Amino acid sequence: MTTMDLNVSPLGRVEGDLDVRVTIEDGVVTSAWTEAAMFRGFEIILQGKDPQAGLIVTPRICGICGGSHLYKAAYALDTAWSTHVPPNATLVRNIAQACETLQSIPRYFYALFAIDLTNKNYAKSSMYEEAVRRFSAYVGTSYQPGVVLSGKPVEVYAIFGGQWPHSSFMVPGGVMCAPTLSDVTRSIAILEHWKVNWLEKYWLGTSVERWLDNKTWEDVLEWVDENEAQYNSDCGFFIRYCRDIGLDKYGQGPGNFLATGTYFQPELYTNPTIDGRNDALINRSGIYANGEFHTFDQARVTEDVTHSFYEGSTSRHPFEGETKPIDPKDGREQGKYSWAKSPRYDVPGTGYIPLEAGPLARRMAAGAPGAAAHQDYDPLFVDMVNKIGPSVFVRQMARMHEAAKYLKWARGWLDDLDLHESFYTKPVELTEGRGFGSTEAARGSLSDWIVIEDGKIANYQVVTPTAWNIGPRDSTGALGPIEQALVGSPIMDKDDPVELGHVARSFDSCLVCTVHAYDGKTGKELSKFVINGSV
């Protein structure tokens, strides 16, 4: 048996550097460690500030999903201050949030994920030349329109929010805009342009409605072969190519999922509360663990720091959370190896376990029984996971599936706006309170917990989808979701382990750096290689 350790540093940049160490035995990853190698500390910055500081500070955590940070920060204050949010404001928040995610979908797919499909390791595939033609960085026939048109949806965000990224137009009690009929019609035209010129022309090769008719894995396979346009669309080609090169065979992860949900039915969330949140959601929250569905309850969330560079080794709920960094050198002596905390969820009957966040988690929650009339019920990915299991391929398909779904919703919300009604209700700024705000950013569940005392922020904790997915081992030794997903991955070429990139990117880890590989035992650089198509 041949055993080696492989260090990949940095593997990418998501709210800081990502380093990965894996043990490989006979060409298969048998253990993995993910290290968030950069300290953030936004929670520390917010302590002692005005409660509305979160509206300004948290969107700067991320340049690509700042709108998602603003969305959940606004709802955290809405629940803490018991505000009234007019239905129009909820619709605008929904539209803006959806448009930010819509821009992320093609940008992520072509610029961060699909270029790996041109890796020389796949040159023996009969479809390799076509993959190179479509997905090569900058010059690919699908890469160019996909990346260029990815910017269209956030033009809609800017119409309502004044700018994108880093807008601050969502505030407790509503939104700071008064859109006109011209604003709405421009927004409709922009989304139609994006749909016609990318989503239906390049990705689907058919209408949004036809794709959304697919409810089972068999439906998807039949859809591919239904006609030449669908067979040769980027979606049809991606399905065929992934199955040919084996991306449907690894990257499973824990198989347990968390979605906190997003988008509210306007008339059901005019007075936001923590307890009333789940019932008002359109894109549902939920837990899928050990083959069973459970209701999401924010009170069951904790953050473990046993293997994180923070004081102590206890788990705390975010309302009582602490962010007390220590010297990494001291931390390593205690067995700590990452700046990320380890979020865990107390699943009824199971206990605290790691859960995968992201598009696949959202799609699993959407497949749960019992959806109300206003809520999304979409059984496709529950069916796929049950029949072929989670994988790099299935995780990626879940992300792309949401392009059609969110576009349809955003278009409907634009029609629902009543331009003669209010978009804001001035709140009473309470000096004491606790609030919880959450959303589904493009890469998964994103949440804020705020504690207000004497009119100032006493505690502010942000739990990102990256933390859910990339967090290290916990006090029980349970691996984080990406660590689990890396285990079992085949490594064709130790000098160019593109498979590691596939797995990490299927969680949308935004990896954009050239990578060096080192033998973990000798320290010798094996090679300098590119796993995302750019140097």
Regions found by a protein language model. Give the residues of each.
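A translation/RNA-centric and nucleic-acid-associated enzymatic feature enriched
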Residues: 448-453, 461
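Active-site bordering "gate/hinge" segments
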Residues: 1-443, 454, 464-535
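Catalytic-core signal marking the mid-to-C-terminal active-site face
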Residues: 458
